[in-house]
């Protein structure tokens, strides 16, 4: 697997993609990118604003372009948005242009990690657990479909998970 130069992290909200990605990039001396941060940088607004103004569909169009651009780079670790996996184009780009690591976590951990985060538009509802369960039912099979490696993140620090990824990839 080591012939691919990019590492792409996929998984649900609260799996630790951004935090683990930063550790992984630092440990491997690679550039780190976060697709949500790149969208915010390009629009000059936060994700919640993009959702409010353009809706989820408008956000997904932006996300598809950002992921297409970032996956063309070499020598990067990319943390993708949790919903990016729903796009066939994004799945194809991730699979073709790097190693895909699925960061798996439980609904309980997702709830605990995201409950105070107001920057997650899909969770600004009365029952975020129900939303997370519905998203998992749709998205988890897609994460599994393109994953080269699956790593559980529930009870471990970001640094430990980053080390596990490095071990599994043989770096």
From Swiss-Prot:
Question: What does the cofactor field's note say?
Answer: Binds 1 Mg(2+) ion per subunit.
The positions annotated for binding ATP are 14-19, 120, 156
Sorted alphabetically, which PROSITE patterns does this protein's record hold?
SHIKIMATE_KINASE (PS01128)
Instruction: Kindly list the GO molecular function terms attached to this UniProt entry.
Output: ATP binding; magnesium ion binding; shikimate kinase activity
> What are its cofactors?
Mg(2+)
- Keyword vocabulary terms for this entry: Amino-acid biosynthesis, Aromatic amino acid biosynthesis, ATP-binding, Cytoplasm, Kinase, Magnesium, Metal-binding, Nucleotide-binding, Transferase
Reactions catalysed: shikimate + ATP = 3-phosphoshikimate + ADP + H(+)
Instruction: Output the GO biological process annotations, alphabetical, semicolon-separated.
Output: amino acid biosynthetic process; aromatic amino acid family biosynthetic process; chorismate biosynthetic process
Which intervals of the chain form a coiled coil? none
UniProt key word Transferase: yes
SUPFAM superfamilies associated with the record? P-loop containing nucleoside triphosphate hydrolases
Q: What are the binding positions for substrate in this chain?
A: 36, 60, 82, 139
This protein's pathway reads: Metabolic intermediate biosynthesis; chorismate biosynthesis; chorismate from D-erythrose 4-phosphate and phosphoenolpyruvate: step 5/7
UniProt superkingdom: Bacteria
Residues that coordinate or bind Mg(2+): 18
Pfam families in UniProt:
SKI (PF01202)
- What InterPro entries does its record include? P-loop_NTPase, Shikimate/glucono_kinase, Shikimate_kinase/TSH1, Shikimate_kinase_CS
EC number(s) per entry: 2.7.1.71
Alphabetical list of CDD domains matching this protein: SK
Q: HAMAP family this protein is in?
A: Shikimate_kinase
Quaternary arrangement and interactors, per the entry? Monomer.
Q: Which family does it belong to?
A: Belongs to the shikimate kinase family.
List the protein's name: Shikimate kinase
């Amino acid at each position: 697997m080591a012939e691919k130069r990019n590492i792409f992290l996929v998984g649900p909200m609260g799996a630790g993609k951004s935090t683990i990605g930063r550790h992984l990039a630092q440990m491997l001396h690679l550039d780190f990118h976060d697709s949500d941060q790149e969208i915010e940088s390009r629009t000059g607004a936060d994700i919640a604003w993009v959702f409010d103004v353009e809706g989820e569909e408008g956000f997904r169009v932006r996300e598809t372009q950002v992921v297409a651009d970032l996956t063309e780079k070499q020598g990067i670790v990319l943390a993708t948005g949790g919903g990016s996996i729903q796009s066939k184009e994004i799945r194809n780009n991730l699979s073709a242009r790097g190693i895909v690591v699925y960061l798996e976590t439980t609904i309980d951990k997702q709830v605990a990690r995201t409950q105070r985060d107001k920057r997650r538009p899909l969770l600004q509802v009365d029952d975020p657990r129900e939303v997370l369960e519905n998203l998992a039912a749709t998205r988890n099979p897609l994460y599994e479909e393109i994953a080269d490696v699956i790593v559980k993140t529930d009870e471990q620090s970001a640094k430990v998970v980053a080390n596990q990824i490095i071990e599994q990839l043989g770096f």
